Amino acid sequence: MDVEYIIVHGTFTPAHMDVSVGDLERWHVKENGWSKVGYHRLINRGGRVESILPLDEPGIHAAGFNDRSVGIALAGGQSKFNGEAVWDFNYTPYQMAVLTRELIALKAFFPNAEVVGHRDVDDRRCPGFEVKELAKCL
């Protein structure tokens, strides 16, 4: 797979909720009817990285970009505002440190890939922060 993008996502879950691969399987496969979990990597609230899909296998995480991208999801990203769920930067320092490390490693493996947020390739707010600003520091 020719990787042109490394796309960062949030799971759009509350800060108090950690997310497992099992949760993603339930949401993506059982509830959405997808053939597999959509992301290549999950970074949980404590900063642990879970590898889900091989990097040479297309994911299901960004319509129109799946066959040329790698998807990394951070657990979290949701807060309440006036009783409504909204995107928010509520990721832990551990997650951000590990995300930075993962992005550096992936850029070494895919040097021409552009690091973006899901919001940069789709009409969404995911992951709740400007990934391109983080990418400038890599």
State what each model feature region is.
Residues 1-11, 45-49, 66-68, 75-138:
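Basic/polar, cationic surfaces and motifs that engage anionic cell-wall
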Residues 1-57:
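Short, conserved "active-site rim" segments that organize catalytic pockets and cofactor/ligand binding
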Residues 56-65, 104:
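Short amphipathic alpha-helices and their capping/turn segments at secondary-structure boundaries
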